[in-house]
Amino acid sequence: MTTRAPLRIALAIATALACVLALAACGAKQDVTSAPATKRFTVMLDWFPNADHAALYSAIADGDFRAVGLEVQPVVPSEAVEPLKQLAAGKIDMAISYEPELLLARDEGLKLVSIGALVQRPLTSIIALPGQHVSTVKDLAGKRVGTAGISYQAAELHTALQHAGVNPAKVQEVNVGFNLVPAMLSGKVAATLGGFWNYEAIQLQIMHKHPVVIPVNEVGVPNYDELVLVVRADEARSDGVDLRAFMQALTRGERAVRANPAAAAKLVQAANPSLEPKLQLESIERTLPAALPAQAGKPFGYQDPTQWAAFGRWMFQQGLLKSDPDATGLPPFTNEFLPGQGI
């Protein structure tokens, strides 16, 4: 595993946190209690509506967003790379994306910032079917592993292999796009890296395939927030009231999901009728522990500064980023808009 940041990085984190407070200085100091009118607020999902978005749909259905003055409208992207591009272009108000994608976008100069974590740890996993005789990462030696062709997934695979003492040259990486499950079922690859333990793994279990599932953060990849809520940095300075209201309402939505996962699954199903109901409910139930911070007393959405620093440093060391995120000035995230986190 990657070790903790040395003292200079810890100092950089402290400086970054000070910048975070300045970043949101224009935001509300107290949680929103009521609002007489509503303002349209467009949120582009990271992918099609699914269990990962249950809190969002619950907050919409229960009127939590309307209660704080927001008329939230989810938008489905045409491709996975679209949300952050649309956000940077000013065409949407918020994007649900991935911590690695946000760091890549910022490295290219996009002034974006995460205001909350929707899923607090990696969902990305190495998945294999029993017939391939893969029970540990070491068993991948000499085999073909499928990925979606995403740069940081290749780096995650290499890190996992090196962590297990396997020469990456002994493993053939195959780009199977988003056809991860078909590639395993057909035997095209012995395993995949890119599927989620709360989705593709459950899908295979429902098919009685009994997959082996190895989350990447358990085999050498630093922990990171799989899904984050991203806004433009300028809006984080000027629209603090709306962002605080959004997070307050979303927190209520998360509590509703936790209280009644079955009802939340029906809302997700209504948003995307093509989904398999059993898969959505099981996915919601298994994802619930990952929706809250590991640190006791921290609110829903909390982002760990040490964790972000370690993962950003890992991406830089892997050659995925041109600059170390700790040295770029504007922090990649802020916790300022979470309920109870204002000053």
Regions found by a protein language model. Give the residues of each.
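Bacterial signal peptide processing site
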Residues: 27-29
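C-terminal motif of bacterial Sec signal peptides marking the signal peptidase cleavage site
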Residues: 21-25
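Secondary-structure end/capping motifs
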Residues: 238-318
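Bacterial N-terminal signal peptides that target proteins for export
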Residues: 2-14
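Short, glycine-/small- and polar/acidic-enriched structural segments
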Residues: 32-177, 181-198, 213-215
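Conserved C-terminal helix/tail region of periplasmic/extracytoplasmic solute-binding proteins
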Residues: 308-343
